């Protein structure tokens, strides 16, 4: 029952475009898992879709998705806090709560040992479920022996995410024809690197903004007092800020692996502490991957090649009698800027005051949970071959708004308007 209520809360959060600071703090106090940001286990979508205009049916689906739930990427993310607590334990300055946390961290390290960054069983399940819902929601796209063209970055968790979706689709329709690949050849659009934008993202302005916000808003003393008996020891031997962030990351990642059934670290934090740590993480994502003025205001254009590829692939496939499906699997660092480049749900905002992000409804949790995905679903009217092709975009399987002229049905946009607007936007960016 508790698990059921948790997912209901996640669904309510995901569907909301403007969550006030107070309401989100209240949600965290009841369901601390929501503070996990990009470590949030994929929320089950509401299942509600607006009917297409009369006579229109889905004919093609294009997609970019993040890998599913994983372990933390680096062994050091587990070992660094373990070593801090072990040294304190040897010095006899750990509290009972500190000793309990150390035991839990050792269990988490053992579970993740030599699996750092790998897909968890829950991550595999998430992609199976996403593929099943794709098939059930848009059966006309997957009919007969259409082609499913799938590409992944050359990272194993992404490749396995792709394979789990493909296997699920084949289970529903064994006649599907599959092409799947993971090659450095495609990284120019699958996982584009951009030196200019990276330099702006890693600038001192971004770092100073985050550091100064943390000094003003995050008080680590209460947490340290719950872990350590000796204030002087903490002052001399512990990087309280680093330890706080490490423990927050570990508390957040628990929900993504099987160990979630046996332990939690959220009781270590107060709701206020979780909210502040979430705010910091949310600001980090905004400053580095959205249109933050502190990082130049152009970070979403890191996905310009991906969006061009989505458009050209769609035009090519839509010219075929049976367009099929195009799937792409990568990372949150692509999904986030692509979401902002598209301005889904008014996500492409520019604010100098990062304290206002939550009040303005900007939430990275809503955009990049584990297995985050953007689906472009294309509709045609078979009785009117010359009628406009329509497109609908789903963010994490929920209908999203676009900054385009409206049609007769909410969330459905003319493909011609889509191309005109976004190709013009892409042309406005000068490398």
Language-model regions: role of each:
Residues 1-24:
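Bacterial Sec-dependent N-terminal signal peptides
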Residues 22-147, 153-326, 330-431:
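Signature for phosphate-centric chemistry
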């Amino acid at each position: 029952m508790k698990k059921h209520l948790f997912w209901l809360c996640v669904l309510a959060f995901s569907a909301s475009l403007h969550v006030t600071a107070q309401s989100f703090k209240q949600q965290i106090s009841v369901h601390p898992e929501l503070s996990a940001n990009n470590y949030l286990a994929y929320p089950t979508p509401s299942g509600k879709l607006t009917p297409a205009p009369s006579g229109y049916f889905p004919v093609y689906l294009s997609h970019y998705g993040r890998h599913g739930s994983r372990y933390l990427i680096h062994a050091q993310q587990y070992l660094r806090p373990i070593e801090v607590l072990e040294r304190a334990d040897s010095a006899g300055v750990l509290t009972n709560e500190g000793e309990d946390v150390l035991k839990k961290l050792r269990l988490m390290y053992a579970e993740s040992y030599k699996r750092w960054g790998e897909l968890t069983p829950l991550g595999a399940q998430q992609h199976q479920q996403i593929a099943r819902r794709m098939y059930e929601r848009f059966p006309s796209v997957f009919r007969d022996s259409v082609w499913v063209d799938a590409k992944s970055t050359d990272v194993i968790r992404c490749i396995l995410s792709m394979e789990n979706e493909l296997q699920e689709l084949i289970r529903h329709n064994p006649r599907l024809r599959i092409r799947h690949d993971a090659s450095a050849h495609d990284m120019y659009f699958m996982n584009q690197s951009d030196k200019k934008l990276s330099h702006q993202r890693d600038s001192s302005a971004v770092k100073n903004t985050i550091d100064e916000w943390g000094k003003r808003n995050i008080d680590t003393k209460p947490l340290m007092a719950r872990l350590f008996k000796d204030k002087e020891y903490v002052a001399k031997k512990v990087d309280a800020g680093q330890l706080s962030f490490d423990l927050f990351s570990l508390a957040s990642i628990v929900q993504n692996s099987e160990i979630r059934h046996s332990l939690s670290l959220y009781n270590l934090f107060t709701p206020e502490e979780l909210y502040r740590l979430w705010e910091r993480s949310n600001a980090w994502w905004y400053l580095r991957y959205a249109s933050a003025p502190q990082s130049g205001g152009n970070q979403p254009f890191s996905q310009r090649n991906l969006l061009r590829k989505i458009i050209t692939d769609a035009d090519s496939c839509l010219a075929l009698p049976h367009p099929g499906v195009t799937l792409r699997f990568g990372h949150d660092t692509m999904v986030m800027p692509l979401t902002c480049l598209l301005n889904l749900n008014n996500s492409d905002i520019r604010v100098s005051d990062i304290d206002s992000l939550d009040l303005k409804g900007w939430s990275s949790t809503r955009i990049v949970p584990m297995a985050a995905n953007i689906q472009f679903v294309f509709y045609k009217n078979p009785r009117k071959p010359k009628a406009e092709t329509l497109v609908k975009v789903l963010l994490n399987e929920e209908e999203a708004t676009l900054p385009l002229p409206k049609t007769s049905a909410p969330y459905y946009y003319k493909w011609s308007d889509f191309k005109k607007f976004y190709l013009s936007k892409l042309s406005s960016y000068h490398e």
